[in-house]
Amino acid sequence: SPYAFTKSKNIELLENLKKWFNFKFEVIFFYNVYGPKQIKVGDMATVIGIFENQYLNKKPLTVVKPGTQSRRFTHISDTVQICYEAFKADSCKYYGISNKNSYTILQVAKMFNSRIVMTKPRLGERYASALTNISSNNKIIQKYGKLQLKDYVSSFIKSRKLWK
């Protein structure tokens, strides 16, 4: 894919800059970040943000068929903490930030205890959560978030019930 190609070329460029000019960097790969102030509408909206918006507007949650697409979701607090740790390390490393748990999109929708509507499959839909792998001499340091998606969604729903 163009995305994978670009990512590969950018990594290659960073490695060359490090070799030629002693350039310092930390590369961090994010996986489905969610949390307060996430984007809830539009092309850049997150899955969790879209579901929150649909829930708040009392609309059915839309899940792209077949719903078995799996993803790893990482809370923004975990993401920021690990970014800070990587910045402090200052070691020209590659990091992947995710959660150990993977959920299908349908499982996530069901966490909201709301009506679900299945929509047509999309071209180019990714069906599995793919953790980044680099095929050069560089190994990705996998970091896992501590905050759990189920707890976040449960807290979101409880806080909305208090508003009523």
Region spans (language model):
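Active-site helix of classical SDR
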Residues: T6-K9
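C-terminal substrate-binding subdomain of Rossmann-fold SDR/epimerase-dehydratase oxidoreductases
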Residues: L56-K164
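Conserved Rossmann-fold NAD(P)-dependent oxidoreductase catalytic core, especially the SDR/UDP-sugar
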Residues: S1-P2, E26
